[in-house]
């Protein structure tokens, strides 16, 4: 199944600290998370070990929300959270 990344998703990815490669990885290998309004969601935790906005974070959690339209996955948006989780990619 193909993945179509909406321009809105890419804009948010840049603002929030992720990229197209991670978005595709989350969809393909992430774990399912609850989503509203009939949408689907997946998340994945990555090692980060860097500063972001003048604070150090061990990990980041990337959450992607999407729909399935025919034979393709179409992204809606992406969220990125910084902190420390148990699950690591």
Where are these regions (language model features)?
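Ribonuclease/tRNase effector modules and their secretory precursors
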Residues: 1-89
């Amino acid at each position: 199944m193909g993945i179509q990344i909406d321009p809105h998703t890419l804009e948010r990815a840049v603002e929030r600290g992720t990229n197209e490669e991670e978005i595709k990885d989350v969809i393909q290998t992430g774990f399912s998370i609850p989503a509203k309004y009939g949408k689907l969601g997946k998340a994945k935790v990555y090692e980060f070990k860097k500063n972001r906005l003048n604070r150090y974070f061990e990990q980041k959690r990337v959450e992607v929300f999407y729909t399935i339209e025919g034979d393709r996955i179409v992204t809606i948006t992406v969220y990125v959270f910084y902190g420390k989780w148990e699950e690591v990619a």
